[in-house]
Amino acid sequence: MRRFFLGAIAISILLVATGIGTTVTLAGSGPLKPGDTLFPLQYFAEQSQGELITTDIGAAKHFISIAGRRAVDLGSIAGTSDELLSIYYLDQALDQAAVAVAKTERTEIEIFRLDLVDLLLQIRDSASKLSVVPIEDPDVYNGLIAKIESLQNLIVNPDSV
């Protein structure tokens, strides 16, 4: 029995050390981007964190922040074969941000207006750098541009809904 406990303790220490080492390595390498092998783990963590937020304002800020990260990712991935995947994750993040903002009180939407404007400017900048998707998948690219314009119209004139 003693041998079992010593083995279990050794395995536990090994797992903790491996976890710490992996965390330090990932933290040192910067945030992951769509197309990276471990990006789905980061995506899962972001989604899980969003589900734990209990206020509508907090959730909206969280998902706007994630959409901002995806917009930056899109710009840094421009010119690679991962553009389409990055657009997919950006599209998902925009949908989540829009739903989260819609759940807030109408009077609280002003809190997010500047963040949303900054987000849309970042997306426009990143989209202008794309070179693969506009040629290989013009419908996807045009859909992204249409979504940006639609969200911009909602920000400029929220009463038009």
Language model features with spans:
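Long, charged/polar, soluble alpha-helical segments
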Residues: 1-161
